Curated annotation (Swiss-Prot):
Keywords: Chlorophyll biosynthesis, Chloroplast, Iron, Membrane, Metal-binding, NADP, Oxidoreductase, Photosynthesis, Plastid, Transit peptide. This is Magnesium-protoporphyrin IX monomethyl ester [oxidative] cyclase, chloroplastic. CDD domains: ACSF. It is an enzyme of class 1 (oxidoreductase). InterPro entries: AcsF, Ferritin-like_SF, Rr_diiron-bd_dom. Its cofactor is Fe cation. Residues 1-45 form a transit peptide. Belongs to the AcsF family. GO terms for biological process: chlorophyll biosynthetic process; photosynthesis. Its EC number is 1.14.13.81.
């Protein structure tokens, strides 16, 4: 699952908008414990190649260097849903709209496993990591951490859905299980990348300590469809850019993005089929409102998030805002084929609103980094948060584009290039 599942507009902490502190330094983290505030923290364990710790005093136990990393800094969150409702939705005896032939065709796509031998590393990885220094190295580690967490989040959700739907609809259940295979493969590949920087996410600990954000099934469908499709456009855009500009190929993981994005696209096609099988999620006024809401949630989150990390995109030769707008345009056009309404993102006013949100967000971040007392910081944030919310509401109220229908041309699972 791509990092677009970072739906911070739905996150009460709103850490993407500067209310949480910026990312801590990325040092090897060992113990996981509960902070005094009660927030669960998780660990990044040191890899074998980590720098040796200072020698311990004679007779004293050896300690490894550690720096805690707050869970909220490594998004997206982990999602759960109403599995009983899911079972009802995919029960062919209850839901006569299910097109099993369509799901059978998709299942064959997933069984083919086009990328079974794609994610194989070579010595270039470690060599490139050793050459990367300064701010780019730090922010690249954060990119790997966040991406690994996103993929692992998808793995856990898809795995559970595959398990729970096995009796109700074995075909749909198997597709979810095969998607969890893909997500696990992606997460493992990214975690191997962290080992090039002498780090590794402790995924076993994440499995035990994860927190869940509950989404109703229809919200899972909207959000995950967008997550997979926007992930496709992000990956293929970066791949094409670096293929045309190889001097910015700072790390070989990007060379894998062309095949990688095919997984994202197949996952999105499956969620498109799920939505078509539930026309009540697409054919009324509530569906139009929710479709616009989730589109905006994903687009705004990505734009603000990426603008906080421009050094990463500049490091690979991209203009952050131009890259994001291209991804938003393409994702919106793809989404319009299935969602009943989408935002008019090509209206120039939409980008102006996004840029104003970025400016407000930077001010909120600046307050968080100041030396003011916590109470003073909170008081200073209030009017800025109100401005940010106002801009988000104004973007939502812009005239939308009436779009897709469950009756559009017959679905054929295929890749977009």
């Amino acid at each position: 699952m791509a990092s677009a599942m970072e739906l911070s507009l739905l996150n009460p902490a709103m850490h993407h908008y500067g209310i949480a502190a910026k990312t801590a330094s990325h040092l090897p983290v060992v113990p996981a414990r509960r902070a005094s505030s009660g927030a669960v923290r998780f660990r990044v364990r040191a890899a074998a190649a980590a720098p040796p710790a200072p020698a311990a005093k004679p007779g004293s136990p050896k300690k490894r260097g550690k720096t805690e990393v707050n869970e909220s800094l490594l998004t997206p969150r982990f999602y759960t849903t109403d599995f009983d409702e899911m079972e009802q939705l995919f029960n062919a005896e209850i839901n006569k709209q299910l097109n099993q032939d369509e799901f059978d065709a998709l299942l064959q796509e997933f069984k083919t496993d086009y990328n079974q031998t794609h994610f194989i590393r070579n010595p270039e990885f470690k060599e490139a990591a050793d050459k990367m220094q300064g701010p780019l190295r730090q922010i690249f580690v954060e990119f790997l951490e966040r991406s690994c967490t996103a993929e692992f989040s998808g793995f856990l959700l898809y795995k559970e859905l595959g398990r729970r739907l096995k009796k109700t609809n074995p075909v749909v259940a198997e597709i979810f299980s095969l998607m969890s295979r893909d997500e696990a493969r992606h997460a493992g590949f990214l975690n191997k990348g962290l080992s090039d920087f002498n780090l590794a996410l402790d995924l076993g600990f994440l499995t035990k300590a994860r927190k869940y954000t509950f989404f109703k099934p229809k919200f899972i469908f909207y959000a995950t469809y967008l997550s997979e499709k926007i992930g496709y456009w992000r990956y293929i855009t970066i791949f094409r850019h670096l293929k045309a500009n190889p001097e910015y190929q700072v790390y070989p993981i990007f060379k894998y993005f062309e095949n990688w994005c095919q997984d994202e696209n197949r996952h999105g096609d499956f969620f498109s089929a799920l939505l078509k099988a539930q026309p009540q999620f697409l054919n009324d006024w509530k569906a139009k409102l929710w479709s616009r809401f989730f589109c905006l949630s994903v687009y705004i989150t990505m734009y603000l998030n990426d603008c906080q990390r421009s050094a990463f995109y500049e490091g690979i030769g991209l203009n952050t805002k131009e890259f994001d707008m291209h991804v938003i345009y393409e994702t919106n056009r793809t989404t319009a084929r299935i969602f009943p309404a989408v935002p008019d993102v090509e209206n120039p006013e939409f980008k102006r609103k996004l840029d104003r949100m970025v400016d407000i967000n930077l001010k909120i971040i600046s307050i968080g980094e100041s030396n003011d007392l916590p109470l003073v910081k909170n008081l200073k944030r209030v009017p800025l948060i109100a401005q940010l919310v106002s801009e988000i509401i104004a973007a939502y109220l812009m005239p939308p584009i009436e779009s897709g229908s469950v009756d559009f041309a017959e679905f054929e699972p295929k890749l977009v290039y």
